[in-house]
Amino acid sequence: MMLNATEFLTPNAINVDTVNETIAKVTLEPLERGFGHTLGNALRRILLSSLPGAAVIEAEIDGVDHEYSTLEGLQEDVLDLLLNLKGLAITLHDQNEVFLTLDKQGPGTITAADITLPHNVDIINPELVLGTLSDRGHLKMRLRVVMGRGYEPANQRREDGDTKAIGRLKLDASFSPVLRVAYQVENARVEQRTDLDRLIIELETNGTIDPEEAIRKAATILQQQISIFVDLEAEEAPEPVKEKEEVDPVLLRPVDDLELTVRSANCLKAENIYYIGDLVQRSETELLKTPNLGKKSLTEIKDVLASKDLELGMRLDNWPPADLRVDDRFSYRSR
């Protein structure tokens, strides 16, 4: 197998070694040098933090007001009972929240199998020990189970009026169905190349998801998150909106509005001066060079402009305005 310097090897062999229902070892090879750690670390983080799962987030126990209470007939402290509830491996089918009940009379051991389940809820580890009751012991409690991702401390959970009620004990929730993930990178060889990686991922779940399915879901999440880069296109910067510069309305009026003498008006039109804005930009020297326009006409023009707070030789940076089309001038000229 010959590859040029710019081509990448892609894995062509994947082996899944299932130890039991909850533990599996997945081997992927060959990978380019360094890609074993790149993919291994990314998949490990996703497996531990991003797969959805169900967990108990709240418990109500008859006769118990807070987690530091003791319950007569229960050998364990309430804190120990709550800690044991975190070990429940629960599967919810087609729902995001459910309430479960447990009503147990002593003596005897309390296990997850004592929890009453609706038809759409399964407990994968019914043998889990929750506590022990003496002869006169009686435990009755109600559990709130929800779907989530990652780890959610109880003190960061949003509360409403009901969840703040006395007797509702909040639990830190670990929703991840993956209990443990470890990966290692070994050397791999393909023909003459010995600088390749072999990625080995070993993981353990709580039984609510198959280890192979967990890997598949983690890879799908990773693919979805980075797929946006495949079609990455730089957004075109929007063109700045040019603010329309205000022009003195007087400058947009035709020179005829100045009511000059016929002689002066005709001289200006001969020099293609149609608007007052055209006129004020001319200097006295320029106007005196106009045929048939003498000092008397110049004085007349200066006096009329002065009456409108204007003068000759003005500098107008925004003249002519964009909306003053060339054809406007020609139409004016033909009048």
Curated annotation (Swiss-Prot):
Keywords: DNA-directed RNA polymerase, Nucleotidyltransferase, Transcription, Transferase. InterPro entries: DNA-dir_RNA_pol_insert, DNA-dir_RNA_pol_RpoA/D/Rpb3, DNA-dir_RpoA, RBP11-like, RNAP_asu_C, RNApol_insert_sf. It catalyses: RNA(n) + a ribonucleoside 5'-triphosphate = RNA(n+1) + diphosphate. GO terms for biological process: DNA-templated transcription. SUPFAM superfamilies: C-terminal domain of RNA polymerase alpha subunit, Insert subdomain of RNA polymerase alpha subunit, RBP11-like subunits of RNA polymerase. Residues 1-233 are annotated as: Alpha N-terminal domain (alpha-NTD). The keyword Transcription applies. One of its GO terms (molecular function) is protein dimerization activity. Belongs to the RNA polymerase alpha chain family. The N-terminal domain is essential for RNAP assembly and basal transcription, whereas the C-terminal domain is involved in interaction with transcriptional regulators and with upstream promoter elements. DNA-dependent RNA polymerase catalyzes the transcription of DNA into RNA using the four ribonucleoside triphosphates as substrates. Homodimer. The RNAP catalytic core consists of 2 alpha, 1 beta, 1 beta' and 1 omega subunit. When a sigma factor is associated with the core the holoenzyme is formed, which can initiate transcription. This is DNA-directed RNA polymerase subunit alpha. The lineage of its organism: Bacteria, Pseudomonadati, Pseudomonadota, Gammaproteobacteria, Moraxellales.
